[in-house]
């Protein structure tokens, strides 16, 4: 017989640096899950990824206080900031204060958008890569990025 699911926890955790501090500790502790077990397993699975990359994770909690988790691909905004060169160690990048009003904070090309679409395809609600590119293009515009090409 399958285990009874008691709930889901959705978090965004930096790759390779999960620790029991908030937001992980309180979210898992509330459900009675072993926090350190999750942190070790998550860090082991994300060790090959770029350290600090935000990774969405869906944790399924079971009645016997065990859990499973599924890693998703990083958010589109992370890839767009990286492609536009906004994300640096010294100054964390942010989008435009007034998107769509003529002030752009960076530029991305269609080739970069299709590359991002290929990476995100399994997590997007799209049938084709072209539809995914259009969706990501909309995200880029709402962040104040100029799409070229």
From Swiss-Prot:
Domain of life: Bacteria
Record-level Gene Ontology MF annotations: large ribosomal subunit rRNA binding; structural constituent of ribosome
UniProt record, GO biological process: translation
An annotated GO cellular component: cytosolic large ribosomal subunit
Keyword Ribosomal protein in record: yes
Post-translational modification: One or more lysine residues are methylated.
Keyword entries, A-Z: Methylation, Ribonucleoprotein, Ribosomal protein, RNA-binding, rRNA-binding
A Pfam entry, by short name: Ribosomal_L11
HAMAP family xref list: Ribosomal_uL11
Subunit structure: Part of the ribosomal stalk of the 50S ribosomal subunit. Interacts with L10 and the large rRNA to form the base of the stalk. L10 forms an elongated spine to which L12 dimers bind in a sequential fashion forming a multimeric L10(L12)X complex.
Biological role stated in the UniProt entry: Forms part of the ribosomal stalk which helps the ribosome interact with GTP-bound translation factors.
Name the UniProt record assigns to this protein: Large ribosomal subunit protein uL11
Organism: Xanthobacter autotrophicus (strain ATCC BAA-1158 / Py2)
Lineage: Bacteria, Pseudomonadati, Pseudomonadota, Alphaproteobacteria, Hyphomicrobiales
Name of the coding gene: rplK
């Amino acid at each position: 017989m399958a285990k009874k699911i008691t709930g889901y926890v959705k978090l965004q955790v930096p790759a390779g640096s999960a620790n029991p501090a908030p937001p992980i500790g309180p979210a898992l502790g509330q459900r009675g899950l072993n926090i350190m077990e999750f942190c070790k397993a998550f860090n082991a699975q994300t060790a090959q990824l770029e350290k600090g990359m935000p990774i969405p994770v869906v944790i399924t909690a079971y009645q016997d206080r065990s859990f499973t988790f599924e890693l998703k691909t990083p958010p589109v905004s992370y890839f767009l900031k990286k492609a536009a060169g906004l994300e640096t160690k010294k100054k964390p990048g942010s989008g435009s204060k007034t998107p769509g009003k003529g002030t752009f904070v960076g530029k991305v090309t269609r080739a970069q958008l299709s590359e991002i679409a290929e990476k995100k395809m399994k997590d997007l609600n799209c049938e084709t890569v072209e539809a995914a590119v259009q969706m990501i293009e909309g995200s880029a515009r709402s962040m104040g990025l100029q799409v070229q090409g």
